[in-house]
């Protein structure tokens, strides 16, 4: 209001974004109590400076060195994509951790969305949670309009969007009973490259994306957290930065 900008800064639903299509929306990825610290910092900064939102806003965790016993190499994304197409469960650990409640591709568990039973497998054998709970997805941004009615770009996975009728049988593992899905859009980075490889193999530019943790436990933070969780959960592969780790 001070600068007479016709913009809104809110935390609200997909319907509001659709209704006010001519307005610009800034919804932070911190849609839980942890957002209070960001709000206080942003407000304080605005009193003395012009606030510039950094591009890596969602990834404010520490950066860790890979354990010395793990040898870094060039990551074979084609191999990882084939694992996913074969129905394997892949834990994905890269860079700085997410700040907020959503797994956005740095501390994620990934699986193919093509098979309805994958939802039950993850709920029962991996996450150990109620069978009715849905899973989110991640999609290449260029294909968003092909799969979702609203087609709202969402790099922070903030909106539940309606899966188009002709696509519901292609991604049943992430299509909820009301035909919606909370979807994340990506257009760059390693997760985007993995999606491109998966799309070449499967014809589907979407993956199931859920947080890398067991039920009742926090999302993994350190490399040691990731290794411990990988060994104690029913996960087939751990991709840690540029290294693929399997189980004997």
Regions found by a protein language model. Name each.
Residues 1-10:
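Single conserved hydrophobic/aromatic residue that forms the stacking wall/gate
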Residues 11-248:
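Flexible beta->alpha loop and helix N-cap segments adjacent to enzyme active/binding sites
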